[in-house]
């Protein structure tokens, strides 16, 4: 640990193998919380490298509990969190729209770290069982085409990181790594990050981890979602190449709103917002969900433009298919 910490503090990047070995030491309980915290902070101050993200992701994914699903072409749309926007649960709401539109959604998430309500919190408020065994989760996914994978339940190694992250109260490499370690192998991904400087790097990490197509998004003001206001920046992984782009919501058929219009609350309030959106009740929440679901359809390759994805998202919600998908998950992911 001492050599690795000195290397990072001197501004040098760790190799993928060095990070992998250090991560395994943490997973095996060989390092104290103080050592883990100092390492996370040192990495943040230096700036995380692709080799470090990849090495950590591979170690954590290998240590995860596998989900024996029969489905292929799985996708996730989780973000890094840590943007302190206190918005409603955008990607979680959009996941129902994507699943209703024919995308196999392996929604990976956790409880809140820096916000009022994480994806696990809001889904628990909707009656979703976070603690099903892997075999049952696979059955849910195979039947519904959507499942929620609770990170704490499926990543035993996280118990060494979670207390440290809560005490630090700042985004670290763990925020960046969380979306990379879905227990179900992913073919495509929409990943939100609060750091626009990491768009290209993250897309290249996803490429290295085997994604066939992916989109990494940063919204206005560093939100880890596409925003219905201001300028959105994204990196697109397509045909093994990463390209950078930008767009405004108004350019793809979304009514622009303000950040205050999409702020959420505690889990029960956000659960109500989610249901209202899937019921197609007009609001800034609906526009934001349509935008991010549309982006998800584009990231998945189901449509050939963000605008086409937005149109598909509106159709899926207006027909009631997204609300039906919520009811299906509520009926299956129980126990």
Curated annotation (Swiss-Prot):
Family matches, as Pfam families: Glycos_trans_3N, Glycos_transf_3
Binding site for 5-phospho-alpha-D-ribose 1-diphosphate: 79, 82-83, 87, 89-92, 107-115, 119
Cofactor(s) this protein cannot do without: Mg(2+)
List of residues binding Mg(2+) 2: 224-225
GO terms for biological process, alphabetical: L-tryptophan biosynthetic process
UniProt family annotation: Belongs to the anthranilate phosphoribosyltransferase family.
Protein name: Anthranilate phosphoribosyltransferase
Species annotation: Lactococcus lactis subsp. lactis (strain IL1403)
